[in-house]
Amino acid sequence: MQEINIIDMKQENIAESLLSFMSASPVNFMAAQTLESELEKHGFGRLDATEQMPRLKAGDQYFVTKNGTAVFAFRVGRKAPAESGFKLICAHSDSPGFRIKPNAEMLCEGKVVKLNTEVYGGAILSTWFDRPLSLAGRVILRTDNPMQPETRLMHVKRALLQISNLAIHFNRQVNDGVKLSKQKDMLPVLGIIDQTLSTDNLLLKEIAVRLGVAPEDILDFDLYLYDTTPACTVGLNQEFISAGRLDDLSMVHAGLEALLANDLTPEATQALAIFDNEETGSGTKQGAASPFLAQVLERLVLAQSKALNLTTDPRDDFYRMIEQSFMVSADNAHAWHPNYGEKMDPTNHPVLGSGPIIKVNAAQKYATDADGAAVFSEVCRKAGVPYQRFVNHSDVAGGSTLGNILT
């Protein structure tokens, strides 16, 4: 008789689910689309922010989107708004990469065409060389109403481009560290054109063919490069995950799994907030610095108050609810690197596979304080989940994330 380890099977299923989610989400638009699809599959209704929110009763679950890349989902709790706080998980849909510029085609010697790009976020440039790349994002199309153009998503799944390294024969110092020019060195090759063809609108024509539209109906686009290499497991026991965009799609997936894991009506209202543009400061209408999440949550309280026929001031109820809320800002943390241990704090360095991490920063780049850390650690203890702490090496500047912006 073969013994089956249920815990190992569950972990394996979650890992496979994450790999599928990563591969289906090459850029922020597809990450949001994948998230929306999973929510609808599990009974969440779609709301339109331009329409009146329905009266909400306990157990109702909905989601609303912002600009195609931010998704906010919630499940209404049993208690009246002022009697319980929101329980939120926040993460972000964007990752560092390259955005295609307008008028992107550049004709080179030998009729080779490359595309003009600009770096998005804090990319490690050298990791983009000599990889099979493609395009994904959204395309905006003309309609009869100038104020309401049509949006189409485009995900080219086959390798289409490559950013080619310079051969070592022309760059003998390549392994000694080379300063890269974002404008010169990081432009992907698209192909070789025939003598009879022109580079004029070459990319638009390719987009038009793929979408089945006329080139002149393409008004604009938000297109990005992505690495077509599928996400996979590595390691002797497949204990590691190798993929781009783990920051922060792994936490988007974890937040989704947490929301879907329990479909019972909760005591307090649960919410999952996935923002965009964290990698560039969160200052957009779909970013964490925008008022959209607060507006959605306030409208949620108003709608629930109407359904319960409450006589209290719903706006005051909203503020009271905020004061009782708890938010987890879910982002990636740096585990101990076996080749660069000196970069880590000597006493607060997490290791892979030893539980979630509480990140602390004296400059307040994270939301964590002693009170929040105590609550999270107690939740972990009661759930039987080990946890770790992370603090930056004092000589190494760390990054920031959503938490301190939202709180």
Place the predicted regions along the sequence by residue.
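N-terminal hydrophobic/helix-forming segments and targeting peptides
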Residues: 1-407
